[in-house]
C-alpha cells in the first residue's frame, strides 16, 4: 500500500475512534453524577461529563467538596468518561 493510502487509512481509523464512545457499561459510575461546584468560593475552570449529551462540558469548581465528576482538562474528562 502506498504511503498516501496508509495515511488515509490512519486518518479514517482516528476519526472512527474519536466518534465512537465507549459503552455505558465501561464508563465509571461517577461520570453520571451532575456537575457539583462544591461549597468553597474559588474560581477553578473544570470539566464534567454530561451523560445526557455525552460530552465533556466546562463548569466552575469552587475548590472543595464537589464530586468525582470533576476534571482539570477536557481531555482528561474524555479519557475517563468517553474513552478518548
Curated annotation (Swiss-Prot):
Coiled coil: none annotated. It holds the Pfam family Kunitz_BPTI. Residues 31-81 form the BPTI/Kunitz inhibitor domain. The keyword Hydrolase does not apply. SUPFAM superfamilies: BPTI-like. The record marks 41-42 as: Reactive bond for chymotrypsin. Keywords: Disulfide bond, Protease inhibitor, Secreted, Serine protease inhibitor, Signal. Expressed by the venom gland. Belongs to the venom Kunitz-type family. Serine protease inhibitor. This is Kunitz-type serine protease inhibitor C3. It comes from Daboia siamensis.
